[in-house]
Amino acid sequence: RDELPNVLSLALGSYGLSPLENASYFAVFANGGRSIQPFFINKILKNGEEIEFLEKKEIVENLIESWVGKKFPKKESFTIDPRVSYIINDILLEATRRGTGKKIQSLNRDDFAGKTGTTNDAESTWFTGFNKNILTTVWFGYDQPASLGNNEFGSSTALPIWLNYMEEIIDDIEYGIQPRPSGLIAKKINLI
């Protein structure tokens, strides 16, 4: 919190997060209010044998923390109240049902929540999608900020990449919706 600017536009995304930070913060919602230690995929095998991709950087326990410059809490710690996590998770589920993340419906699963993002002038876009068993963030942009072009958004750039990845692994991901914590009451409100 100390490194975030104290400005009202922060809620609209005025502060740029790295993909790792984005995944770390969204993981709190995927884990019922608990913070987790994020990690990178460093190797992908085809048919269990041929290496399709191999991350060249050595992955060690504190490498991620050294890149980001701060410690991440261990899984046991609650960052936010589980009831708050559930409500935000429910809102993000709606974003994948009727909002900018609705392309997720092509997976024929109703347990994935997510959020698209687009910076000013479309210099970078992202999508973070998750259920309680997996969370993945895709960032799309240039190393040196430059516009991606007109009409480029998280839903048209990062989300399709995320979907392509998920289509390959979806059958191996267990269905997972957060259980409703005690202490929450659902009421239908209709002012029309």
Indicate residue ranges for each PLM-predicted region:
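Mid-domain, small-residue-enriched loop/turn segments at the edges of structured enzyme/sensor domains
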Residues: R1-S24
